[in-house]
């Protein structure tokens, strides 16, 4: 499994590789704009940043067009930070049920990037509990700086690219 932050970069790197190696799972881990939904459905197997109705509707539409089912994580803004993406906890239930019941998209878990304030465990625990309340099995949380803490809270996907490849320019 591999992750990419940007659709354009993924297209330039992975289009040919995935044709020759269809068993590779490609994860969209960055912010996904709704106008990139068509390309995202064609390229990716997982989307970790589902966070609004327009995006969900576009992704569902292109899944039907391309006859492809992706796996989704709803991105939760766990602390309602103004500068972070994600759906608020107060809207999570309605958004989740709309996605699975109306759009019939395969939401497999929640994703969050908590504040980097030394209290990440509190947020990881909260996300784990929300995930369980919705009956979901997968959790996408933990990055290079805090993935060890996230592992204590049943995370199944971590993003550790900067630990492996270094920081982006």
Indicate where each model-derived feature is located.
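Expand to "…catalyze enediolate/carbanion chemistry for C-C bond making/breaking, isomerization
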Residues: 151, 164-169
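Conserved alpha/beta-domain cores
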Residues: 1-138, 143-145, 153
């Amino acid at each position: 499994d591999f992750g990419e932050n940007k659709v354009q970069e993924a297209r330039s790197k992975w289009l040919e590789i995935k044709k020759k190696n269809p068993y590779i799972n490609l994860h969209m881990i960055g912010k996904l704009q709704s106008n990139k939904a068509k390309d995202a459905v064609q390229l990716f197997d997982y989307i970790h940043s589902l966070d609004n109705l327009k995006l969900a509707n576009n992704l569902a539409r292109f899944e039907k067009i391309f006859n492809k089912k992706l796996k989704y994580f709803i991105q939760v803004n766990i602390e309602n930070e103004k500068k972070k993406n994600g759906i608020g906890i107060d809207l999570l239930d309605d958004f989740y049920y709309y996605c699975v019941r109306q759009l019939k998209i395969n939401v497999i878990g929640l994703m969050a990037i908590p504040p980097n304030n030394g209290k990440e465990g509190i947020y990881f625990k909260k996300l784990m509990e929300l995930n369980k309340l919705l009956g979901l099995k997968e959790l996408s949380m933990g990055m290079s700086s805090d993935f060890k803490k996230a592992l204590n809270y049943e995370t199944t996907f971590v993003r550790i690219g900067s630990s492996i490849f270094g920081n982006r320019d």
